[in-house]
Amino acid sequence: MIERLLLTGAGGRLGSYLREPLSKLCTELVSTDIKSQIGSLYKNEKFVSADLAKFDEVLPLTEGVTMICHFGAVVDELPFDNLLGPNFVGSYNVWESARKNNVKRIIYASSIHAVGMYSKTKTITPSTHHKPDGFYGLSKCFTE
């Protein structure tokens, strides 16, 4: 069983779907989102509202964490300035705070938008070069 798991983006589409099953896999689930609330909490879950673009809010979240599921990001194609904080700086802050606090494992969800502009008939493999289809895809490349 995972001792302490940090879930970023807990109020988003993927995070809200995974909260319950993840709560069954760990002793303590620390859920975070930029939203001020995410609804009812599971018995071993605590919620901390935080802005991933602010390192001083992310660093304490990773203290004593065994594993991070990093799903916190803006998932829409928007102008670069709208994605810079949450997707680029936020992801950097998660990885850097994990490094500083010796977190051993991070699970990250990428996107087909990172690989991007290939024909539907091309087989995509781990060695396929990135061709992001926009700033959202570029943010996924950056985090990978």
Specify the residue positions occupied by each region the protein language model found:
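NAD(P)H-binding glycine-rich loop region in Rossmannoid oxidoreductase-like domains
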Residues: 50-86
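SDR active-site strand-loop-helix element
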Residues: 8, 32, 68-71, 106-112
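Conserved Rossmann-fold NAD(P)-dependent oxidoreductase catalytic core, especially the SDR/UDP-sugar
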Residues: 93-135
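NAD(P)-cofactor binding segment of oxidoreductase domains
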Residues: 68, 79-106
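Short loop/helix-cap segments at secondary-structure boundaries that form the rim of catalytic
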Residues: 36-44, 60
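Active-site Tyr-X1-5-Lys
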Residues: 134-144
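N-terminal Rossmann NAD(P)H-binding glycine-rich loop of SDR-like oxidoreductase domains
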Residues: 4-25
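Conserved glycine-rich Rossmann-like NAD(P)H-binding loop of the short-chain dehydrogenase/reductase
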Residues: 26-38
